[in-house]
């Protein structure tokens, strides 16, 4: 169920200049980066790109969701890492993205880790936003 404006706890604001070949910065100055297309897409690869920024945001958000689920389940995920791989390619509408999420949870058996990751995928705001729109594989 979508949230309403009155439900918002925090709003991030970022402004891009010159799209994929420019810069992007947040209004608070916490992020100010050069953006360039990767070499695979004809760019010089000298800066970051939207796919890297999306992967960074998704992995951090998913890690937070994993922590919430782990606390509810009484599991210790303090040494866990989450990696998001975001690919971009052509589709019938122009371009689309695909995501792979993997988590390493030391000290937790494989079945429990898998269950935690699947539960995190249900509550992660990025997962909710992408559900039904792009392919997201849990590895």
Roles of regions detected by a PLM:
Residues 1-56, 63-139:
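Extended beta-strand/beta-hairpin segments
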